């Protein structure tokens, strides 16, 4: 009877081995590798470790999603690329697209939820999100929408050549002496001087500086010590650059446990743990963190299969001893 029970147990274990090998799935319990102890293989059922936390959702909108928009009415696109309706998505400093407004006069483009410059004024919307008419706003490298440089005036026509002078006539015969002329009339009073021309209009205000760092500048960093890169891509040291919600890179920290990548100023996952840094900026060991399509740094796909292979070798050795 005892030998029959062991045979049934061996067949059940072989069946589990085939299922796990075919699907490359991790078991819901820990099987110890021990070739001398029989039924202790299944003691790991009571010591099952909890699953690792799911990574945060990947970006859904804005600069992190190719300029995509939120679908539901009333949702705002946050600076991290996620959609929602609370202050963490819609309030100033946290919203990058589909924000509730209002916006300052002269604002335009994605920085003002797609607002356009006034029509008929010849204004262009610059990369910085401001309206203007100079090349700082309208040149192709500086413009994000309504890009149209005014055409230069046509050149003046070349001067026409002077007409040919006619041949000089023969000298006339001397005229008879003129009669005595009356005294000349007195000259008219001088006309009043014309009014001065109107003053020229003031020059237009200069354009804001172009982005210097972060995702608006190809991942560039601020140069000066202590400067933070704001969500708009400019460098500075005040709260408008360094405080949470306004800082995207070179922020003073601290960062939550498990954060990594550009979302945590280039912070790495702990070494020697097999953790990968996901596109969302969190550390983990599953394919949600380590697969090439999901990983931004410390991408190590070997950690996905090696624990399963070690468990399979232990089960195989145990089955050979039992049978």
Curated annotation (Swiss-Prot):
The keyword Repeat applies. It comes from the Eukaryota. Sequence repeats lie at residues 151-159, 160-164, 165-167, 168-172, 173-180, 181-185, 186-190, 191-192, 193-198, 200-206. Residues 58-101, 105-149, 210-253, 257-301 form the Chitin-binding type-1 domain. SMART domains: ChtBD1 (SM00270). GO terms for biological process: defense response. Residues 1-22 form the signal peptide. Glycans are attached at residues 50-51, 53, 55, 151-198, 200-206, 209. Chitin binds at residues 78, 80, 82, 89, 230, 232, 234, 241. The keyword Ion transport does not apply. The modification 4-hydroxyproline is found at residues 50-51, 53, 55, 152-159, 161-164, 166-167, 169-172, 174-180, 182-185, 187-190, 192, 194-198, 201-206, 209. Residues 151-206 are annotated as: 10 X approximate repeats of S-P-P-P-P. Heavily glycosylated with beta-arabinose on hydroxyprolines and with alpha-galactose on serines of the extensin-like domain. As no other sugars could be detected in the native lectin, it is unlikely that the three putative N-glycosylation sites are actually glycosylated. The N-terminus is blocked. The N-terminal sequences proposed in PubMed:9022287 and PubMed:11056399 originate probably from truncated proteins. Keywords: Chitin-binding, Disulfide bond, Glycoprotein, Hydroxylation, Lectin, Plant defense, Repeat, Signal. Homodimer. In the central section; belongs to the extensin family. This protein might function as a defense against chitin containing pathogens. Binds to several branched or linear N-acetyllactosamine-containing glycosphingolipids and also to lactosylceramide with sphingosine and non-hydroxy fatty acids. This is Chitin-binding lectin 1. It comes from Solanum tuberosum.
């Amino acid at each position: 009877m005892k030998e029959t029970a062991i045979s049934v147990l061996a067949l059940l274990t072989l069946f589990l081995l085939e299922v796990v090998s075919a699907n490359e799935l991790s078991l819901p319990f820990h099987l110890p590798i021990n070739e001398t102890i029989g039924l202790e293989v299944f003691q790991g059922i009571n010591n099952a470790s909890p699953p690792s936390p799911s990574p945060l959702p990947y970006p859904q909108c804005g600069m992190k999603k190719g300029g995509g928009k939120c679908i539901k009415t009333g949702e705002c696109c946050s600076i991290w690329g996620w959609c929602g309706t609370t202050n963490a998505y819609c309030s100033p400093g946290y919203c990058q697209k589909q924000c509730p407004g209002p916006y300052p006069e002269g604002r335009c483009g994605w920085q003002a939820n797609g607002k356009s410059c006034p029509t008929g004024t010849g204004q262009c919307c610059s990369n910085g999100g401001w309206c203007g008419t100079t090349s700082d706003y309208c040149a192709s490298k500086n413009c994000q929408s309504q890009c149209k440089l005014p055409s230069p005036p046509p050149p003046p026509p070349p001067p026409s050549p002077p007409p040919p002078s006619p041949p000089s006539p023969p000298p006339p015969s001397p005229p008879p002496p003129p009669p005595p002329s009356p005294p000349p009339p007195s000259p008219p009073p001088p006309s009043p001087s014309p009014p001065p021309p109107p003053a020229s209009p003031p020059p237009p205000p200069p354009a804001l500086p172009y982005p210097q760092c972060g995702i608006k500048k190809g991942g560039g960093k601020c140069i000066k010590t202590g400067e933070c890169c704001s969500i708009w891509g400019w460098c500075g040291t005040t709260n408008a650059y360094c405080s949470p919600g306004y800082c995207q890179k070179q922020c003073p920290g601290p960062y939550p446990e498990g954060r990594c990548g550009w979302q945590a100023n280039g912070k790495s996952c702990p070494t020697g743990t097999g953790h990968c840094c996901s596109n969302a900026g969190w550390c983990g060991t599953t394919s949600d963190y380590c697969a090439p399509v999901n990983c931004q740094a410390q991408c190590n796909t070997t950690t996905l299969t090696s624990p399963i292979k070690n468990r399979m070798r232990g089960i195989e050795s145990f089955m050979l001893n039992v049978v």
